[in-house]
Structure formats: structure tokens, C-alpha cells
Amino acid sequence: MKKIRLELVYLRAIICAIIIITHLLTQITLKHENMEGGSLVLQFYIRNIVIFGTPCFIILSQLLTTLNYQKVTYRYLTTRVKYILIPYILMGLFYSYSESLLTDSSFNKQFIENVLLGQWYGYFIVVIMQFFILSYIIFKINYNLFNSKILLLLSFILQQSFLYYFTNNTAFHDTVLHYYPLSENTIIFGWIFYFFLGAYMGYNYERVLNFLERYLVIMIVLAVATYFVFIALANGDYWNVTSFSYSLTPYNSIMFIVILGICTHFKTMLFNTIQMISAFSFFIYLLHPIILDSLFAYTNIFEDNTMVFLAISLLFILGLCIGVGMILREFYIFRFIIGKQPYKLNINAY
């Protein structure tokens, strides 16, 4: 039986909450489309502080894989198709239908552009599925490759080089998009370092925890320092906030390590709630943007007090998503929508 690692339960829940907060801050910016000057710059830097959610999910996904497996079978892939890819498609069908009604456009057009090409918030699942295939291939070659510092360094160079030229070289950018049919955010070269970082940390997990026990404060200082590096590299486009950026790679990576280190100190705090958020995190990720606009129409009245706005919005979103998930959980067939993790919850403990 796999050991339950409480710090990873807390970590997954916190990353889930961070992604919701990122989208809430985006809603505020979109509402004030005429924002400019100091207000726009301030919003830009605040939003980027919490932009590390998606990279952290990629790191965590591969960390869990190399932590829990030393070899895999073909079932490793089929399980992820059933409980990750199929929910992505089914929720994508619902999203595409609702968008076609909202925008009075073709359902087929919405489904192709959003779900198949990855031009929606669920693009992250397309990236993850590519990494599942890559992980399977590496397992079949040699599990110990996940422990390679050389591969880790090369992946960092590859990701940074790709993102730098993709951002700053118009010819390179246009050539890539000419031959790559999906959304640019799904190109794995822009995320490859996070994959190998998660793999390396999962392979050396106990050593990572020992390191964080001694040097967590140093990692926090490094996180602050790397964010100032990002500020120094900012190009003046204060509307575009994305984790698909070479200037944020060090910050995103170190923030994952910092949050993991902080989570090692949590044992029982809000544990029942944290356990539910963690178990339903995949479903929350897919569902919350669908309800976000409608909920924001109410919670934006608290916008002048940002912390109150975020707290109330986060509470309602988590409550609605988990509530819907708990009802669907009563029927085993809905594992193809909410995933399999919610079925591992011990409801009698609540």
C-alpha cells in the first residue's frame, strides 16, 4: 500500500487554489479593459506572483510518477486516458456547447478550436498527456534517467532557449506555429524542464525533504530574488500574463520547492477540507472556469477589498465544484468526469 504523504495532499490543494486565484485576478483585469499606467503595472506584477500554478501541476504530476513507480506497464497509459483524457474531452464537450450558445456560434467550431487544438483553459491537459507518453518511453528505456543531472540541465537549456526565441524572434515564432497545429501553449518544449525537475525530485524525494528541512529559508530568499530577475526582464507588455515565459522559469520552479517545504510543516490544519480539495483538484481545474464569469458577476462587488474578494470568490468556487463533485461521486460512472481520486475519499471521516 502506498504511503500517504500529507505534504503532497496539502501541496496539490494549495496549487489548485493558486490557479483559481490566478483566474480571479485575470477577471479583475479584464473588467477594467481601459486600465493603464501604474494600476496596470501593479496588476501585472501581482498576477505574475501567483502565475506558477500550471508549472507546479506539471512538476507535481511527474514527481508523483517517479516517486510511486520504478517501472510501468501499458496500463499506466490506458489509466490516464480513462481518467484524465476522457474527462478532458467530456468537460470540453460541455464547455464547447455552452460557449456555442453564449456566442451564437457553431458547436463544431468551438469543439475543434478549444478542445482539439487546445485554445482554452484546459490546454494544460494536452501538455500533461504528452508528458505521460514521454514518461512511459523513459521508463521503458531506463528509470535511472530520471536521476540524470545532465538531462535536467539540458532540459533547462532547451526550455529557456525555445521560450526566448519563441518570444523574441518573429521568424522562429511564425515558423513554429506554421508547422505546429495545436495551441502554442501546448508545445512541450516550453514546459520540458518542469517535467524533468518533477522527475528528479520524485526520484530523490527523501533527499529533497531533508534539504528543505535545512534550507527552506534560503529557498524563500531565492524565490524573491528570481522574481526581481523577472521584473528586470519585463518587456513592457503589461496585459500579457503567462507562465509560458523564459523569464519566469526560475521563479516558477523555486516556488514549487518553497511551497513543498512549507507543506511539510502541515499535519492536521483544515485537513478534511484540504483532502477534499486535493481529491477533486482535477475536476475543480476543469469546472471552475465555466462558472467563473457568473460568479464574478456577484463577487466583484467586493473588488475594492481585494482580500475579501479573493476569499469569498475562492470559497464559493471550491464549494460549488466540490459540491457538484460529491453528488457525481455517488455514481461510479462519473469517474470519467471527476477522475478516480474522489473515490478514494473516506467520507465517513468527515
Swiss-Prot record:
The source's superkingdom equals: Bacteria
- Protein keywords: Cell membrane, Membrane, Transmembrane, Transmembrane helix, Transport
* Listed Pfam families: Acyl_transf_3 (PF01757)
* Disruption-associated phenotype: Deletion of the icaADBCR genes leads to the inability to form biofilms, produce PIA or mediate N-acetylglucosaminyltransferase activity in vitro.
Q: How does it sit in the membrane?
A: Multi-pass membrane protein
Q: Is Ligase there in the keyword field?
A: no
Q: Which GO terms describe its biological process?
A: enterobacterial common antigen biosynthetic process
Cellular compartment(s)? Cell membrane
Q: Which residues cross the membrane?
A: 8-28, 40-60, 83-103, 119-139, 146-166, 182-202, 216-236, 254-274, 276-296, 308-328
A GO molecular-function descriptor = O-acetyltransferase activity
Q: Report if keyword Zinc is assigned.
A: no
Name one cellular component (GO) term: plasma membrane
Q: Which family is it part of?
A: Belongs to the acyltransferase 3 family.
What is the annotated role of this protein in its UniProt record? Presumably involved in the export of the biofilm adhesin polysaccharide poly-beta-1,6-N-acetyl-D-glucosamine (PNAG, also referred to as PIA) across the cell membrane.
Which protein are we looking at? Probable poly-beta-1,6-N-acetyl-D-glucosamine export protein
Origin species:
Staphylococcus aureus (strain NCTC 8325 / PS 47)
